[in-house]
Amino acid sequence: MRKQQIPTLSTSALDKSPGPGSPDSDIEMKSTSVKSDIDELAKLLKDKTKDGIAIFNSALKVCIENNPNALLHEAAEHGKKKLVVEILKVNRDSINSTTPQGLSVLHSAVAGVNNKKEIIEILLNEEPILVTKKDALGLTPSCYNTSTEILKILQEYERNVIDQALIKPAKYVPITPPKCLPIEVVQSNLEKAFEEYMGYKLVGQTNPTNSDEF
């Protein structure tokens, strides 16, 4: 049973948002392309022979080139654990991608057709901060969840992320001690300051003429 629907546009149109005047058919074709890629890759992944692995790796690279970010979202949404792992090996950066609606790949996994715990844990182990990401409506992945087991996992990661942020040490800024002036310069400055204060020079200065003699 599907836990919660995510609009197809949010994942499949991730890499190609329609521009002004673009026909809706372009989006539909993009959606079909990503889904067919996932289905084909899932079949190829079953072949564990040397040739089969080589064919899969080659096909995966092509699919990622065509849909660098949407592919991971689609695999996560449909519970393709092994594909998620393989995609991350080749395209690690796609884990931080978002849809036009602001959905992270964790949103897609939690709200997907098969929100397998294993996929959610894989994503969180790779990028714990995903648990705090908000979509365009300000909702975190836990807001899309309907499973008590998954909710516990998400809440635990949320606490860990918050705790890490609170105990993060302040950035160390080394303090440079002030440079000391040579002793001769210090003495000279002190003498000048004292002379100005007293109103006459100390060196070679006689008593003022109007002073009383005893």
Swiss-Prot record:
Residues 1-14 have a biased composition (Polar residues). It comes from Rickettsia felis (strain ATCC VR-1525 / URRWXCal2) (Rickettsia azadi). It comes from the Bacteria. InterPro entries: Ankyrin_rpt, Ankyrin_rpt-contain_sf. Residues 1-32 are annotated as: Disordered. This is Putative ankyrin repeat protein RF_1081. Keywords: ANK repeat. Pfam families: Ank_2 (PF12796). ANK repeats lie at residues 67-135. Disulfide bonds: none annotated.
